């Protein structure tokens, strides 16, 4: 099952869910990079540098990742309260 709440965890079986809604958690148990389904338009992968579980938002194309351990290149910072991130290519701020 795909968890759509960013306050909940995710089971290892959620590594590549198909019936995803607006967002889905990708667990750290997934090795290397994990591709999200094509329903995200386009499908993207979670980079290894994101050490904690990350939420993949679909508000922008291409999407970026919200994780405290992510570096500054488009990822949300720990102080952010929203998972709606913008990629660097967007004209809006990259976080929240």
Curated annotation (Swiss-Prot):
<dbReference type="GO" id="GO:0045095">
    <property type="term" value="C:keratin filament"/>
</dbReference>
<feature type="repeat" description="14">
    <location>
        <begin position="90"/>
        <end position="94"/>
    </location>
</feature>
<comment type="function">
    <text>In the hair cortex, hair keratin intermediate filaments are embedded in an interfilamentous matrix, consisting of hair keratin-associated proteins (KRTAP), which are essential for the formation of a rigid and resistant hair shaft through their extensive disulfide bond cross-linking with abundant cysteine residues of hair keratins. The matrix proteins include the high-sulfur and high-glycine-tyrosine keratins.</text>
</comment>
<feature type="repeat" description="8">
    <location>
        <begin position="55"/>
        <end position="59"/>
    </location>
</feature>
<feature type="repeat" description="11">
    <location>
        <begin position="75"/>
        <end position="79"/>
    </location>
</feature>
<feature type="repeat" description="5">
    <location>
        <begin position="35"/>
        <end position="39"/>
    </location>
</feature>
<comment type="subunit">
    <text>Interacts with hair keratins.</text>
</comment>
<feature type="repeat" description="13">
    <location>
        <begin position="85"/>
        <end position="89"/>
    </location>
</feature>
<protein>
    <recommendedName>
        <fullName>Keratin-associated protein 12-1</fullName>
    </recommendedName>
</protein>
<dbReference type="GO" id="GO:0005829">
    <property type="term" value="C:cytosol"/>
</dbReference>
<feature type="repeat" description="10">
    <location>
        <begin position="70"/>
        <end position="74"/>
    </location>
</feature>
<keyword id="KW-0416">Keratin</keyword>
<feature type="repeat" description="4">
    <location>
        <begin position="30"/>
        <end position="34"/>
    </location>
</feature>
<keyword id="KW-0677">Repeat</keyword>
<feature type="region of interest" description="14 X 5 AA approximate repeats">
    <location>
        <begin position="10"/>
        <end position="94"/>
    </location>
</feature>
<feature type="repeat" description="1">
    <location>
        <begin position="10"/>
        <end position="14"/>
    </location>
</feature>
<feature type="repeat" description="7">
    <location>
        <begin position="50"/>
        <end position="54"/>
    </location>
</feature>
<comment type="similarity">
    <text>Belongs to the KRTAP type 12 family.</text>
</comment>
<feature type="repeat" description="6">
    <location>
        <begin position="45"/>
        <end position="49"/>
    </location>
</feature>
<dbReference type="Pfam" id="PF13885">
    <property type="entry name" value="Keratin_B2_2"/>
</dbReference>
<feature type="repeat" description="9">
    <location>
        <begin position="60"/>
        <end position="64"/>
    </location>
</feature>
<feature type="repeat" description="12">
    <location>
        <begin position="80"/>
        <end position="84"/>
    </location>
</feature>
<feature type="repeat" description="2">
    <location>
        <begin position="15"/>
        <end position="19"/>
    </location>
</feature>
<feature type="repeat" description="3">
    <location>
        <begin position="24"/>
        <end position="28"/>
    </location>
</feature>
<dbReference type="InterPro" id="IPR002494">
    <property type="entry name" value="KAP"/>
</dbReference>
């Amino acid at each position: 099952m795909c968890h759509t709440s960013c306050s909940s965890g995710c089971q290892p079986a959620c590594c590549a869910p198909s019936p995803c809604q607006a967002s889905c958690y990708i667990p750290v148990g997934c090795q290397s990079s994990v591709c999200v389904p094509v329903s995200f338009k386009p499908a993207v992968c979670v980079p290894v540098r994101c050490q904690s579980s990350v939420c993949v938002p679909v508000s922008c194309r291409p999407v970026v990742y919200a994780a405290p351990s992510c570096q500054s290149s488009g990822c949300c910072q720990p102080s952010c309260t929203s998972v709606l991130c913008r990629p660097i290519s967007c004209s809006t701020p990259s976080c929240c």
